[in-house]
From Swiss-Prot:
Signal peptide per UniProt: none
EC number: 3.2.2.27
GO cellular component entries: cytoplasm
Pfam short name (any one): UDG
Main location: cytoplasm
Protein name per the record: Uracil-DNA glycosylase
Gene Ontology molecular function: any one: uracil DNA N-glycosylase activity
UniProt-listed SMART domains: UDG (SM00986), UreE_C (SM00987)
Function as written in the Swiss-Prot or TrEMBL entry: Excises uracil residues from the DNA which can arise as a result of misincorporation of dUMP residues by DNA polymerase or due to deamination of cytosine.
Location(s) in or outside the cell: Cytoplasm
Keywords, sorted A to Z: Cytoplasm, DNA damage, DNA repair, Hydrolase
CDD domains: UDG-F1-like
Catalytic class of the enzyme: hydrolase
Length: 223
């Protein structure tokens, strides 16, 4: 199994998925502002192919402010100030990775291109309404994505931050993959153990131990 088409192509023709897409389409057509824009909903899959995935970082649902979400978990468009959770991710990187310099932006596309699947478990949201699309069926779809990675890839690193991601990843085969857990990087919980978790260096140490090229976590300082 080499591509997302092979991995989840059949899922996209399931009735629940067609109904889900129709609900999102109707919401947009009725004038509601839905993030991310339609052409970016599946960006995580377009940028990181199935056979290229090395690390999976699970988010929850997209940012719900203007111009933030573009289809990659935790990432924002280049012109947007990094949100608090991403600021805390950068703080941990600066502690964990020698020489890491905090960029001026929150655009994580360089990670995606190296094999970091930045996957939200719900792929759309209505402006200003967190979790507004949580019951549409996205969770069924992203469960399938994780199951296919679990079953048809090996030696992946899953970074599960917060209880939602940890529950979502509870069935991942720990003998086949590396699963690292920590509190969410949100300001509400980062001090409970996200800071100091060293997940970025641990991910690279695991990849290296399996003979897999590591991730360069350093992002361009400006974009």
């Amino acid at each position: 199994m080499n591509s997302w088409t092979e991995a989840i192509g059949e899922e996209k023709v399931q009735p629940y998925f067609q109904q889900l897409l129709q609900q999102v389409y109707q919401a947009r057509a009725s004038g509601k502002i839905i993030y991310p824009p339609q052409h970016e909903v599946f960006s995580a899959f377009a940028l990181t192919d199935f056979k290229a995935v090395k690390v999976v970082i699970l988010g929850q649902d997209p940012y719900h402010g203007p111009n933030q979400a573009h289809g990659l978990a935790f990432s924002v468009k280049p012109s947007v100030v990094p949100p608090p959770s991403l600021v805390n991710i950068y703080k941990e990187l600066a502690q964990d990775i020698a020489g890491f310099q905090v960029p001026s932006h929150g655009y994580l596309i360089d990670w995606a291109k190296q094999g970091v699947l930045l996957l939200n478990t719900v792929l759309t949201v209505q402006q200003g309404m967190a979790h507004s699309h949580a019951t549409l069926g996205w969770e069924i779809f992203t469960d399938k994505v994780i199951a296919q990675l679990n079953d048809h890839r090996e030696n992946l690193v899953f970074l599960l931050w917060g209880s939602h991601a940890q529950k979502k990843g509870q069935f991942i085969n720990r003998s086949r993959h590396c699963v690292l857990t920590a509190p969410h990087p949100s300001p509400l919980s980062a001090h409970r153990g996200f800071f100091g978790c060293q997940h970025f260096s641990k991910a690279n140490a695991y990849l290296q131990s399996k003979g897999i090229a590591t991730i360069n976590w350093q992002l361009p300082l400006v974009v």
